[in-house]
Amino acid sequence: MDWQLDAAELRVLGALMEKEATTPDYYPMSLNALVNACNQKSNREPVVNFDEETVETALHELRAKGLSSRISGESRVPKHEQRFVEKFNLGRREAAVMCVLMLRGPQTVGELRGRTERIFTFDDLEGVESTLQRLAEIGFVKKLPRQTGYKEQRWAQLLAGDIEVAEEAAPAMMERGASDRDRIAALEEEVAELKRAFEQFRRNFE
């Protein structure tokens, strides 16, 4: 690749890919919706608090790299969509894995299988592994050395450059705590999405 993404560009691109798959009725996305998608608490590691300027700048850079486009249709509000999947001719499996790695950082094969389920359902771990191998062949991901405290090796995306692995221990208790936070954040996000859908429904009848 002759380009590299910064943290904001990576989050924006990942959010666009996720919402295209999970909420197609609200895609392409307005700037405001994209800010909310970047900042949501569920399915995000780390959780961020981007403002509109940060997301707008990231979108500009992504457009310059041919990874997103801006649509000005009948609506007065410009919408944004990702071009990453099309640009690199990725299948649904590859797109799902890349999306989750962009949004949640390095993960094990088992974590990826569970977390990609809303985007693409893998039949088994071998399917995830073979997808990762294909992505590794084109330089998009790599397998990290096993860390102290982890039973399995993790995989990382390389769109934002190579990743340095810290040697600190990662106790199992930390993993369990993260899992609990994931469940709570997911419930909070579901409630927030229901509220947004209701507001959209209400505005349609005003």
Curated annotation (Swiss-Prot):
Q: Which domain of life is it from?
A: Bacteria
Q: Which InterPro entries match?
A: DUF480 (IPR007432), WH-like_DNA-bd_sf (IPR036388), WH_DNA-bd_sf (IPR036390)
Family stated for the protein in its record: Belongs to the UPF0502 family.
User: Can you name this protein?
Assistant: UPF0502 protein Acid_1185
**What is this organism's lineage?**
Bacteria, Pseudomonadati, Acidobacteriota, Terriglobia, Bryobacterales
